[in-house]
Amino acid sequence: NTAAGSNAAQTKKGGKYVDSFMGYLNYYDPIYFTNKVFLHKACAQDVPDTTNALGGILCLWNDVRVDDKTRIALHNGMINGMMVYAERFWNGGEGSWDELSEFEDKMSYHKSHIVKNHDVRWHPNAMTSWKIKIDGNDTLYARGGAVDVNDLCTENSITVGDTVSAWAFTNFNSECDTTIKVWVGFEAAARSNRISGGIGPQGKWENQGRLFVNDKEYFPSQEWNGPEKYAFHFNTWHKPEEELPYTDEQFYWMREPLSIDLKQGDNEIKLYIPKTFRGQRWSFGFLKVTE
């Protein structure tokens, strides 16, 4: 049998196959993973094939040492990952953003009813759209509460250096003056590799990230327990750094949400999202916490 990995051409050779390309919970930002899997073409087939397409493999290989095993599912978004993976591989084919928005209603129902006794670190985010400006390149467009800028560059055949400045822009419309809570992050380190920009300086975001709402700058709402720690600009497999467990504050979806003020009408959200070193998991997250 053939595993359908990054080379989708393998699935055209005949025989039975399993999609082993998109199932790494430990690798992706859990918010981004949920969106990416729903939009993924299961087994590289436009039309579901129940004869040869046997399904997919969902795995969680937390290679970095864990000191509190109760955090593994949370750090890797296991429950929301299982929900979307089951949806995509049960139905086959690939989904659209509009269909994802509808599916988020089902996920929200499951979160509040079926798995209500579990801490599920996920909120609906498919309707958020972004304009992303990377120095020296045309404006790019993305959707979702988490964006993998590396993936976005690959999709648009853009090559950048080891460091580059970039900005992301979106708008939130509010019916009245209000305050909302959001998750904000400028990195999503893989739980299988310690390469990372580490925790930001006290009072600042990681990876030199910055957040502006209607030109007002916002800073982390919590004090870091380990400011400027765990910056490893190299792959840590088979190295001592792999033995250092991640802490909650290194994952934006594990942090206390940030309160931001919105005025009635449109509100400009602007994030500074630089690439700061070679090999960086260049990504960002910004999504409303609905509960």
Kindly give the residue locations of the regions a language model identified.
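Flexible, acidic glycine-rich loops studded with aromatic residues
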Residues: 1-132
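Beta-sheet entry/capping signal
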Residues: 14-18, 55, 181, 208-210, ...
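Extracellular structured ligand-interaction cores
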Residues: 53-55, 79, 167-169, 208, ...
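Generic structural motif
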Residues: 82, 178-180, 186-188
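Accessory carbohydrate-binding/adhesion or oligomerization-edge regions at the termini
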Residues: 108-165, 171, 185-191, 200, ...
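Extracellular and analogous surface-interaction loops
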Residues: 168-181, 258-264
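Beta-strand-rich ligand-recognition modules
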Residues: 194-285
